[in-house]
C-alpha cells in the first residue's frame, strides 16, 4: 500500500452552547498555540457550527486529549480521515499530495481525485434556538469509500530507483536527477523517480517548484545516444543498409555542409560494418544512416514512434517534446537528429 487514510480529529465549536466564552477561548488558545483574540472570535461567531482553521484541523493525539479533558459544552472533536504516505519520498511526485480537506492537488491524487475521495456521510437532526439537539427523528446517510487504484509500479524496482537517485545526488550533487523504467512491450511505467524529492506527508515544508515538478513527465531533454535505436530501426525497416555487408569508415568526424560532427572516440573507429557502428555508438556512422534514409523518411519514423507529442499518461504536466520543423531542416539538422541531438 503506497498511500492510505488514517483517522485524525479536528476541533468543532457550537458557539451557542458555550457559556463562558472568555475562559473557553483562553484554554483553547493555550492548547493550540493560537492567539486569544482569534479564538474568542471563533467561540463568539453567530453560526450554528464553527470550524477552527487551520490550528484546529488534524490534531495530534496529545492535543486531542487535552481538549477532551476540558469537557466544555459546545467544544467537540470530530473524527476525520487524513491521507498517509508510509513510504514518504518514494514515488512522491507520481502519487502527488492532498490538501487539508484531502482534495488532490498534484499527481495521481489530482487526476483521480473524483474516484479516490468517495462521499462523506451525514447525520441530519433538529435543534432548538440555542443549538441544543432535540430528541426527534434523525436521518443518517452512510459514507461511501473511494476506490482503490492499482498501479503498474514494481515496488522493489522503485526502491532500487530511489536508492540510485540518492546515490547520484550524494556523489555528484546535480541540480536534478531522474530515472524512468518502462516495460518496452506494453509501455507500462515500472518505476519513476526524480530529485529533488519531497515527503507528501509534509509537503508544506518544500517550495512549490519541488513538489509540483515531476521531472520525468515535465522536463524536456535531448535523448542523445539512446535515440540511435530509432534511426537504426528505421534504416532496417527501409532496407537502406545491410548491417552485416555494408561498411562505413569513421575518421573521427564527418563534415556536413561545413559543420564538423565528431565521434566520441578520438581518431574514430576506422572501417566498420553498420552492425559495428551500432556496437560502437559511432556518431558519424549514424549520420550516414540518416543521410541514406533522407529527412522525410527519418522524420516520418520519428513521429510514428511518438516523438513530438504527448503519450497521454495519466499524470499532469506532460510536455509535447520538441522536433525540428521539417520544412526548415537542412542537412545538418538531419545529421544531428540521426544521433539524438536537436530533438527532445
Predicted segments, located by residue:
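Envelope-exposed proteins and targeting segments
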Residues: 7-11, 73, 88-93, 108, ...
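Small/polar-residue-rich segments within soluble enzyme cores
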Residues: 6, 22-30, 41-146, 340
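Conserved, well-ordered alpha-helix/loop/beta-strand core segments that scaffold catalytic motifs
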Residues: 134-177
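A short, polar/charged loop-to-alpha-helix boundary motif
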Residues: 8-25, 197-213
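Extracytoplasmic/secreted envelope proteins and their assembly/folding machinery
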Residues: 8, 21-29, 64, 68, ...
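Solvent-exposed coil/turn segments that connect beta secondary-structure elements
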Residues: 6-7, 14-18, 58, 80-82, ...
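Short N-terminal helix-loop-first-beta-strand/juxtamembrane motif that initiates sensory/input modules
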Residues: 73-77, 170-184
Amino acid at each position: 500500500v503506497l498511500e492510505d487514510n488514517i483517522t485524525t480529529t479536528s476541533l468543532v465549536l457550537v458557539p451557542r452552547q458555550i457559556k463562558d466564552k472568555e475562559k473557553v477561548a483562553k484554554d483553547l488558545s493555550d492548547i493550540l498555540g493560537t492567539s486569544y483574540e482569534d479564538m474568542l472570535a471563533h467561540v463568539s461567531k453567530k453560526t450554528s457550527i464553527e470550524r477552527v482553521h487551520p490550528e484546529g484541523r488534524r490534531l495530534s493525539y496529545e492535543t486531542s486529549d487535552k481538549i477532551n479533558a476540558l469537557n466544555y459544552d459546545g467544544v467537540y472533536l470530530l473524527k476525520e480521515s487524513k491521507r498517509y504516505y508510509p513510504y514518504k519520498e518514494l514515488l512522491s511526485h507520481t502519487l502527488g499530495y492532498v490538501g487539508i480537506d484531502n482534495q488532490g492537488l498534484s499527481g495521481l491524487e489530482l487526476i483521480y481525485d473524483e474516484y479516490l475521495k468517495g462521499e462523506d456521510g451525514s447525520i441530519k437532526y433538529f435543534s432548538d434556538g440555542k443549538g441544543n439537539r432535540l430528541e426527534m427523528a434523525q436521518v443518517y446517510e452512510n459514507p461511501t469509500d473511494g476506490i482503490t487504484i492499482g498501479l503498474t509500479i514494481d515496488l522493489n524496482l522503485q526502491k532500487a530507483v530511489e536508492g540510485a537517485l540518492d546515490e547520484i545526488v550524494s556523489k555528484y550533487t546535480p541540480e536534478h536527477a531522474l530515472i524512468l523504467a518502462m516495460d518496452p512491450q506494453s509501455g507500462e511505467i515500472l518505476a519513476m523517480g526524480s530529485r529533488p524529492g519531497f515527503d507528501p506527508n509534509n509537503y508544506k515544508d518544500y517550495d512549490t517548484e519541488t513538489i509540483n515538478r515531476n521531472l520525468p513527465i515535465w522536463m524536456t531533454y535531448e535523448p542523445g545516444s539512446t535515440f540511435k535505436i530509432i534511426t537504426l530501426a528505421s534504416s532496417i525497416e527501409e532496407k537502406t543498409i545491410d548491417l552485416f555487408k555494408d561498411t562505413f569508415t569513421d575518421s573521427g568526424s564527418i563534415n556536413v555542409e561545413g559543420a564538423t560532427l565528431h565521434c566520441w572516440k578520438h581518431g574514430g573507429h576506422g572501417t566498420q560494418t553498420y552492425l559495428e557502428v551500432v556496437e560502437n555508438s559511432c556518431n558519424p556512422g549514424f549520420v550516414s544512416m540518416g543521410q541514406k534514409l533522407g529527412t522525410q523518411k527519418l522524420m516520418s519514423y520519428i513521429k510514428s514512434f511518438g516523438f513530438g507529442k504527448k503519450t497521454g499518461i495519466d499524470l499532469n504536466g506532460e510536455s509535447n517534446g520538441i522536433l525540428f520543423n521539417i520544412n526548415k531542416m537542412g542537412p545538418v539538422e538531419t545529421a544531428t537528429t540521426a544521433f539524438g541531438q536537436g530533438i527532445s
